[in-house]
Amino acid sequence: GRERNGYNHLYLYNLNGQLMQTVGDLEKPGQRLGGVAHTVVTEVYGYDELTGDIYFAALNGDPTNQKVYVSHKNGKTDCLTPKDGWNTAIFATDFKNFVSTWSDLNHPAVYSLCNNQGKTLTTLIDNKALLDKYASYDMGTKEFFVFTTPDEKFIGWMVKPKDFNRGGKYPVIMYQYGGPGSQQ
């Protein structure tokens, strides 16, 4: 997809090479965290030959929120995991069900069994004990921020002290990730 428009999109072609449809066109107006202005497909889970549905994960204007989608043969796309955070899926071979994994900056992974419409059938692992243990440390919560330079916007996250006072002075620990997918 990158060759067509510069972004990682999906396109469905017939066997003659004719473009049939753009898959999962999620473009929407609104504020874009970190300057990401387009949908970026991050993973393709598969194609259901019986229904013509394509299942995939994508970032839609916000690189901190990955969601799982299904694009139908008629071109309509539905979000199967609408909760903000990082969502992934492992689909059954018949695409009737999937195991959803969701987490965000302040919550460990939650694993759920869902149907192919995104309805949660049961929670498999909620990691409540880990969340409660972390809460017992009485720490502040993590939050994203955008750091802007004249040329770029970078996304970071910070943990402020529990009783943060905006006028106070605090020590800072800074770490920059420079590996694959980094913004450096």
Task: Please describe what each predicted stretch is.
Residues 1, 54-57, 98-101:
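Residue position within the beta-strands of beta-propeller blades
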Residues 2, 14-50, 58-61, 71-88, ...:
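Multi-bladed beta-propeller domains
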Residues 2-4, 59-61, 103, 163-165:
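Short polar/acidic secondary-structure junctions
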Residues 6-11, 63-69, 106-113:
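Structural motif
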Residues 70-71, 166:
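Short beta-strand segments and strand-loop junctions that repeat across beta-rich extracellular domains
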Residues 79, 88-184:
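Serine-hydrolase catalytic core recognition
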